């Protein structure tokens, strides 16, 4: 039995709102109709209303996290990851060594809690090689690797086993989009399947989107059609071999972007902006990268104005993924 306010049907919605305002509505029980009256569950007696005891059906609460239902020994629960990536309908999780034996149980719990997730993979290696891919080990759900991911109002088709993609950069991509101006020419030097390129195409006159991974370019071409954009030019190859002039350059290859910086500066128009990404240590994550930028500015005889810099996320213990935006003037 629980407490409920008894009100005529026609007054039900008005009373419900009033109970919410008073903090009295008990959402753990369902409202029940009884003849021409409603029984609205409350946490405590409310002055001015008829309060009765009633048998009401409890609202079944779905767990908020897989951690609430996963079956692992109590002494190992502290090792359970608190976050993982969801790309389209595929979840990718890093499982610590202590829990590798419970990988399938963790996968099962993720599928049960996240109804949109159809497949779960465990990271089997770090991101490696020229194509920036990693080994993925299937632990639950369907054995699929191709999906369509939605972010920032665009759709991105991709294969998580064949291309690099991080949903954690969605906010960063929107930040760059908001900085972009109408009618620009953009050079996305490491475009992947197009999360920057296709988003920026909404403002740009033209986007040159380059990647060395043929699978990335294949999906980029599909995503151009999927999003009905006609101003993105996909280019397969090393971006250092692409001779273009651009008002805005995206350099999202944190581990190696510094090796492409000289070419980026040679491609930028007067007054153009370069969005540079790198990895840096705790304490001074920007120093080495800023020094490199200034060295090349001196070499080219151009002026550099740093517009902003920020830590995007932790990459490894005491290592950060950073971004530096700078304007180049001749």
Swiss-Prot record:
Which reactions is this enzyme annotated as catalysing? guanosine(37) in tRNA + S-adenosyl-L-methionine = N(1)-methylguanosine(37) in tRNA + S-adenosyl-L-homocysteine + H(+)
Q: Which N-terminal residues, if any, form the signal peptide?
A: none
Q: Pfam families annotated for this entry?
A: TRM5-TYW2_MTfase, Trm5_N, TYW2_N_2
Q: In its keyword annotation, does this UniProt entry include GTP-binding?
A: no
GO BP, one annotated term: tRNA methylation
InterPro entries given in the database record: MeTrfase_TRM5/TYW2, SAM-dependent_MTases_sf, TRM5-TYW2-like_MTfase, TRM5/TYW2-like_N, Trm5a/b_N
Q: Is Cytoplasm set as a keyword in this record?
A: yes
| UniProtKB keywords | Cytoplasm, Methyltransferase, S-adenosyl-L-methionine, Transferase, tRNA processing
Family stated for the protein in its record = Belongs to the class I-like SAM-binding methyltransferase superfamily. TRM5/TYW2 family.
Q: What is this protein called?
A: tRNA (guanine(37)-N(1))-methyltransferase Trm5b
Supply the source organism for this entry: Pyrococcus abyssi (strain GE5 / Orsay)
> Lineage, please?
Archaea, Methanobacteriati, Methanobacteriota, Thermococci, Thermococcales
